C-alpha cells in the first residue's frame, strides 16, 4: 500500500489540545495517510498567521490541510481568506458550534476571555492530579485518601492503575486500592463517605487469562494460586459482595477500553 503524505497544520488560539484531539480522531480513519503535524498554538494576531502561511507556501507542491480552533471571528476570517487564495483546504471546528449555541440560546458569545490564565489553571490542576494519582497507586498513602476525587477498588489486574492515570490526565485526583480476598479491607470506610468510590470487576475467564499472561511475563508460572480458576472466582464474588454492601457503583471492565471505562466513571462523577 502506497502511503499518501499530508502536512496537517493545526492552528489554535490556545494550547491546541482540542484541535490535536479532533485531528487524531479523524486520521484514525485513514491508515494509508502519512501525516506530518504542524501545531501552531496561541495564535493571537495576523503576523503569526502570516508565518503559518509562509510555511505552507514553502510546501506548496505537497498536500497541505489547515484545521483551526480560533475563536476570534476576524482572525479566523483572515486565515480562511488566505487559505482560499492559496487553494488550501481549511476547516474551522469550533466556530460552527459556538454559532449554533449562540443562535439557539439567543445570546452573544463572551468576547473577553482570559484564556491564558484559564489554560494555566487547567495545566497546574492536571499536574496536581497526576502527582496525587501516582502517589496513591495500588493502595499507597491512604492516610489522605479523602482528598481524592475518585477512588477505584478492585482485585488485582482489573486495569485500576491505567484507568487512574487516564483520569488523572483529565484532571481528576484518583486513588486506587486493591481488594484482596480473605484480608480485611484496610481503608477507613468513613473516609470514603461522600466520595465517588467505584467497584471494578471483570469476567472470571478473562481475569484468569490476564493473570496467566502476567505470570508468564515475569517467569512465575509456578504460582498455583494467583490464576487458579476456583480462587479467582471466589475472589471476584467476594469483591462484588463487598462493593454491594457499601452501595458502590460497580463497573465491569471486561472487553472495555480504558477510555470507555473512564467515560463511565466521569458520568458517575458528574452526577454527584
From Swiss-Prot:
InterPro entries, per the entry: Kinase-pyrophosphorylase, PPDK_reg
GO molecular function: ADP binding; ATP binding; phosphotransferase activity, phosphate group as acceptor; protein serine/threonine kinase activity
Catalytic activity field: N(tele)-phospho-L-histidyl/L-threonyl-[pyruvate, phosphate dikinase] + ADP = N(tele)-phospho-L-histidyl/O-phospho-L-threonyl-[pyruvate, phosphate dikinase] + AMP + H(+); N(tele)-phospho-L-histidyl/O-phospho-L-threonyl-[pyruvate, phosphate dikinase] + phosphate + H(+) = N(tele)-phospho-L-histidyl/L-threonyl-[pyruvate, phosphate dikinase] + diphosphate
Family of the protein in this entry: Belongs to the pyruvate, phosphate/water dikinase regulatory protein family. PDRP subfamily.
Naturally occurring in which organism (per UniProt): Wolbachia pipientis subsp. Culex pipiens (strain wPip)
Record function comment: Bifunctional serine/threonine kinase and phosphorylase involved in the regulation of the pyruvate, phosphate dikinase (PPDK) by catalyzing its phosphorylation/dephosphorylation.
Coiled-coil features, chain-numbered ranges: none
One Pfam family hit: Kinase-PPPase
Keywords linked to the UniProt accession: Kinase, Nucleotide-binding, Serine/threonine-protein kinase, Transferase
Binding site for ADP: 154-161
Keyword field contains Nucleotide-binding: yes
E.C. code: 2.7.11.32, 2.7.4.27
Protein name: Putative pyruvate, phosphate dikinase regulatory protein
